[in-house]
UniProtKB/Swiss-Prot annotation:
Disulfide bonds: none annotated. Gene3D superfamilies: Ribulose bisphosphate carboxylase, large subunit, C-terminal domain, RuBisCO large subunit, N-terminal domain. Disruption phenotype: Disruption of the gene abolishes the ability to utilize 5'-methylthioadenosine (MTA) as a sole sulfur source. Mutant cannot release methanethiol upon MTA feeding and accumulates MTRu-1P. Inactivation of the gene increases ethylene production from MTA-grown cells. One of its GO terms (biological process) is 1-deoxy-D-xylulose 5-phosphate biosynthetic process. Belongs to the RuBisCO large chain family. Type IV subfamily. This is 5-methylthioribulose-1-phosphate isomerase.
Amino acid sequence: MTDRLRATYRVKATAASIEARAKGIAVEQSVEMPLSAIDDPAVLDGIVGVVEEITERGEDCFEVRLALSTATIGGDAGQLFNMLFGNTSLQDDTVLLDIDLPDDLLASFGGPNIGAAGLRARVGASADRALTCSALKPQGLPPDRLADLARRMALGGLDFIKDDHGMADQAYAPFASRVGAVAAAVDEVNRQTGGQTRYLPSLSGHLDQLRSQVRTGLDHGIDTFLIAPMIVGPSTFHAVVREFPGAAFFAHPTLAGPSRIAPPAHFGKLFRLLGADAVIFPNSGGRFGYSRDTCQAVAEAALGPWGGLHASLPVPAGGMSLARVPEMIATYGPDVIVLIGGNLLEARDRLTEETAAFVASVAGAASRGCGLAP
């Protein structure tokens, strides 16, 4: 039998039908045809998925663990997604719950370029404090207005300032003009204050456009970027990460909702595997419906030991406010990037002061958090 990865699914089925359902998933995620039509022993033994375990988790609810051949992956990130959950994602009774990959497969994809420790080093942050981030909004502002927002945020002492994930190469703020203006504003503040604030442009487009955008950023002294893996595609995301080993990448979760991959596996493992140095996800109690347990599981998957890969920093976000900072630090400890966007921008003329209050609140609360990193 060839090397195998393990994939665990949550399946809605009756006790009478679950065994057949599990075997059906094993076939669908491997050879996708009747086994009776296969006459090659190597395919039957080495490629066909194997049902290893079925565990009942409630009425008409089961966990199914499959062993799938790593040979079917071919070293490609998109094909990894395909063989883990491609056709089965079309079955609305099934969720991809977890993955367990052999060390050689982990090493072949490589994970983050610099990881959690590298991000801390970039902004001069010690290991005992959480990091801070905000976003440039709204869509529609011209480059000079976005640069002014970034300047005032940087004066407040933020670690990271990212583009809103919807910013691309629109006519009202073309990528090159926006990045040049914002990078210059942040760099000027850093030189004045001795700070190390990083600006993260949002990357978009096809592979050649992404390459060009990263190079544009590098030309402006930028070394950290925002990217949406499910928009550009897993293979493209992975290719960009590997092509620019000195760059760091925050992965945005947009469009990940329809995938029905459990968030800890999706953001904490798959995004980390393909190269996310930080993973943004919807925090509990915000605009989205994730539970506190789910959010903690995402953070644990992003930070935990995994075959020698760098840890990814969790970035809980989505409608957060300054009032929630103590709670977030108590939940995640210092091993987190706290992202607050619109709530800061509501300060308008007091943006710098409100940003400074955010930074001070995170610094003051971090020492009281429990932390999730091993």
